[in-house]
Regions:
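Alpha-helical oligomerization segments
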Residues: 369, 374-390
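Alpha-solenoid helical repeat scaffolds
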Residues: 1-359, 366, 386-392
Length: 392
């Protein structure tokens, strides 16, 4: 009678009375399975912990009752506790009581839990029963992509986007497809998918970063910079940090040093490198404890002075070397070798410079000092050995 009265209260949308009646039913019959499940239904959204507590009481009484696991899985899934949801689904999802929707949610919970192999296994099980099912094909594409099985991911994507029944595409679908195509070096196709994703959800401005990355990888720096500007402009001022500005500098540097001379004029190359220099200058001032601003400033100036006739990069490499030497950390050895290589070469050229004849001895000593510093870090460094042999 109490369960019946509880059911009437549910129809009347009186949750308080309904839960009271189900509690009564359990009190008079602790094995009244229906009352536990109905009670959990009332609280699954409003108070999940109460619902879970009641279901666990039933689980203790009936450990093999898959209806309990099913309800627990549903509640954990609703509250985004995918770890617990996976545990609950595992108890029944491969058995006869599982519906297609249960399998979808199990596969998705596994995916969100980063168990891509198991998620793929469950999705493929679903596809054996229904090869054109949108959610299973979606998860196959996602999982194959995350597992870096790109050829299989591409096949799944083809089915998902061209053959599925009732497919309701989201920005995430286009984003994943973009990641997949970018991984396969299909950069133009990747951009098309990223653009579809951001059009579908304009708040996902991170996608402009993906668009920029795709263009950068095909050496289309103008478009890469343009897309990155859109991403950067979408951020609040406090989020426009030096590490994000750093990518601007890298893109300008890439544009100025790209090998394809047809894609960029000499003047455009120079302008790009000057933009890189000013960007890295701003970073050096904003983060004085980091060597990266001046290190990349040195690289930009070295590219502006490819013959090292003006020594444009010299003050920056000197500053970086002094900072990194003070840290005394082998982690910075490769950066120090780059600094010493430039400075060693700069002084090597200065030895032969007629205008600096009076300083030839001092320049020779300086060059020897820097090449020797390289050998102290890397005794097998062939460039340093050759340079020292040439000087001596």
């Amino acid at each position: 009678a109490s369960v019946f009265e509880g059911n009437i209260a549910v129809k009347q949308k009186n949750a308080g009375l309904a839960s009271q009646k189900y509690e009564e039913a359990i009190y008079f019959d602790p094995k009244c399975t229906e009352a536990y499940l109905k009670y959990a239904d009332i609280y699954k959204s409003a108070n999940a912990s109460l619902a879970i507590e009641k279901l666990n009481q039933l689980k203790d009484l009936e450990p093999s009752n898959t209806a309990v696991d099913k309800k627990l899985a549903e509640i954990y899934y609703l509250k985004n506790d995918f770890n617990k949801a996976v545990e609950a689904y595992a108890n029944f999802a491969m058995g006869p009581t599982a519906t297609e929707e249960d399998l979808v949610k199990y596969a998705f919970a596994l995916f969100l839990n980063h168990d891509f192999d198991k998620s793929l296994e469950v999705a493929n099980m679903g596809l054996q029963k229904n090869a054109r099912h949108a959610a299973f094909n979606r998860l196959a594409m996602y999982n194959y992509t995350d597992l870096k099985r790109f050829d299989e991911a591409l096949k799944a994507a083809d089915v998902f986007f061209k053959e599925c029944d009732k497919a309701d595409y989201s920005y995430l679908d286009y984003m994943y497809y973009g990641h997949l195509l970018e991984s396969l070096k299909k950069y133009d196709d990747a951009v098309v998918q990223y653009e579809k994703a951001v059009k579908m959800d304009p708040t996902k401005t991170d996608l402009f970063k993906n668009i920029s990355s795709a263009y950068e990888q095909k050496n289309d720096y103008k478009k890469a910079i343009s897309a990155y500007q859109k991403y950067y402009a979408s951020l609040d001022k406090e989020k426009q940090t030096p590490d994000l500005q750093f990518q601007f500098g890298r893109l300008y540097y890439g544009a100025g040093t790209q090998p394809d001379s047809l894609a960029i004029t000499v003047e455009e190359r120079k302008q790009a490198l000057m933009s890189a220099d000013s960007t890295f200058h701003a970073i050096a001032e904003a983060a004085p404890d980091s060597y990266l601003g001046n290190f990349w400033r040195a690289r930009a100036n070295s590219a502006l002075d490819p013959e090292t006739t003006q020594g444009l990069a010299k003050p920056f490499y000197e500053e970086v070397a002094a900072l990194l030497e003070s840290k005394n950390d082998p982690h910075y050895n490769s950066a120090l070798v780059e600094c010493y290589s430039y400075l060693g070469y700069y002084y090597l050229l200065a030895i032969e410079n007629p205008a600096l004849k009076a300083e030839a001895k001092a320049n020779k000593d300086k060059s020897i000092e820097y090449w020797s510093k390289i050998l102290a870090i890397d005794p097998a460094n062939a460039t340093a050995k050759r340079a020292l042999d040439g000087i001596k």
